[in-house]
Amino acid sequence: MTTDTTFLDFVGATDLVLEISPAQSDRAWQESQSFSNSSTRWRAYLNQLSLSAVLTWLQADYNFQAATGATPAALHSCWEVTNGTVVTIDGIELLLVPSEAIDTSELRVPQEWVDLPKLAPDYYLGVQVEPNEGWVRVWGYCTHAQLKSRGSYDPSDRAYSLDETDVIKDINVLWVSRQLCPEEPTKAAIDPLPTLALDRAENLLQRLGNPTVLNPRLAVPFPLWGALFEHGGWRQRLYDLRLGKNDLWSIQQWLQTRVSEVAGQLGWGKLEFQPSAIGAKGAESATAAAILTRQLTIAGKAYELRVIPHEQLAGVWRFELQTALMGDRIPGGFKLRLLTEDLQPFENNEDVATRAVERLFIEVAIEPREGLVWEIEPLPENYDTEILRF
């Protein structure tokens, strides 16, 4: 829904101005309170306003099935340390880059959204936000390839900028270009960063997790920071540390008490059974008094990831993937994989469906306090790396 722009003398004919309703503003303000300082809270507020307005517009005016492409937890972990929000439309990623600045002489994008292969989007949208007046203005866009080839890099704040003369002002051009040339490349090649060792990552987390470090993204060299930020599990832990939250991803604590609130929002839950009830499912399933489940959507269908402690062997755990619908089967080609916390494979860490099967499973012996990462191919919707701490 667009708003009356007659009072905006600076708005061009092709600019898109969207209303922020009082309800959207109130909700964004409430959601922006879970951050470490006033600066990060304000950044989260601006990002939430732009996200809410743009999603409403895409769904109302274009009937797009648009989504954030990230869970609320992942959004919070990003907004705590940098600016920008990804919106996904039919597999195309748009990064909203909100700013209060009236000056739109350049589109300025944090380096994290340009030089990290897992996070770089197809397009960047410049978004001017005016919270007091209740509107946001989408004033132009560019592709990742355009930003890399024509933009300039500023090491002082680790950002790429593109002059407004190179920014495409009419957002409708984006939709037309996608229709006429859907296969046209939008991204430049990106070299992956060196792997970050686990002990180095832990040292960085302890240092940057201190909320007195007001701008952690500039506190260490970018290769170190980028590797930490790109890893969703480490980024989530950094956010938790900066807010003084501990053991939110402890599997033992989930089983003994309850699943943490943030994990519950992501689809984790706990099921309790009588041991004999679980055993009745067959010898193939390990028995336990309680198991953990994660609800997933893959290719439009519901699945369930289960984490089951072995009844007799301490430290042995079973990961199972199965469909949520009884009698349904996992298609051939699906993969269930476990990795170390620093994303390294290990022996017998993967199960592959060579044909349609009832379930995929992996049994693994885990040391106390060891972290594991689960992966599934094809990727579940809104997937981000999670570190489960045993």
PLM regions and their residue ranges:
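N-terminal domain-onset segments
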Residues: 1-71, 232, 236-274
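C-terminal, beta-strand-rich globular interaction domains
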Residues: 283-390
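Phenylalanine-focused residue identity feature
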Residues: 7-10, 35, 64, 222, ...
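Residue-identity detector for threonine
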Residues: 2-5, 14, 40, 56, ...
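Long, hydrophobic alpha/beta structural blocks
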Residues: 90-293, 297
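An N-terminal, globular interaction/scaffold subdomain
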Residues: 24-140
